[in-house]
């Protein structure tokens, strides 16, 4: 396959900041008396995996190029496979023809976080690596919504059955919440991004709070990235506002003991899910949906860029 000339698209990237997305307003009338304003999230793709096929000729050319380029570290090199990291370890590349033929899947995979790449690095990666692949497409996309608010008290409620795991910090507050299975097509993380940046990269975030809602989409779910959480509600239930002490106690129990949902009759589960939504001053997913809608065209252009439709985002 002939390679695309990327120089014509360089100008589209010059002033691009992948974290600089437009912000949207928000309103919610469920609980006017308890309404709490929250900041508008910043939205980006935080992780991407692109798979495709290398034909024999392209595999040879790419292997020769990678063995000479100083920006690439190669290992596990054989005639039908190799592994590599590129651009200061920010990109992982794997080619394995034998494994692909055995499992009837595409033979090359490229993994990276676009937020960590400069515009020159994006062009380099597309021109020198990804453009060699045929029949390429995404098998993973992570949507990241960053809120400058404390989300430790928020509760994720789904119309579907979701496994829920919560990790608490030394203060007793929740710091990381997982919803779903890591092996599933959709896995949701809500975590204290400010603390994560400090612990993993020793970076101090100036904002008082920075929390991330991250939706990891894999396999066929990547095609629904713009419609991937309609069943989800991220709520801050004001359980103490309920007039009935019995309902207060039950809602508090359900919010803190996930296993208790399984002990309820179907009608009772429906009842308490409805109550939790009604006593919540805000549903973050409403704000996430409006933010996603406002940024959908821009995000689609990013996808198109990696898939050879050179209509880069502004």
Swiss-Prot record:
Cross-referenced InterPro entries, in alphabetical order? REP-like_C (IPR003491), RepD-like_N (IPR054456)
A Gene Ontology annotation in the biological process aspect, one of them, is: DNA replication
Feature: compositional bias, Basic and acidic residues? 11-20
Q: Which UniProt keywords apply?
A: DNA replication, Plasmid
Short name of any one Pfam family annotated for the protein: Rep_trans
Q: Where is the composition biased (Polar residues)?
A: 1-10
Q: Give a yes or no for keyword Transport in this entry.
A: no
Q: Which stretches does the entry tag as region Disordered? A: 1-21
Its family? Belongs to the plasmid replication initiation factor family.
Q: What else is known?
A: The nicking site of REP proteins is sequence, but not plasmid, specific.
Q: What does this protein do?
A: This protein is probably a specific topoisomerase involved in initiating replication. This protein is specifically required and may be rate-limiting for replication of the plasmid in vivo.
Protein name as it appears in the record: Replication initiation protein
What species was this sequence derived from?
Staphylococcus aureus
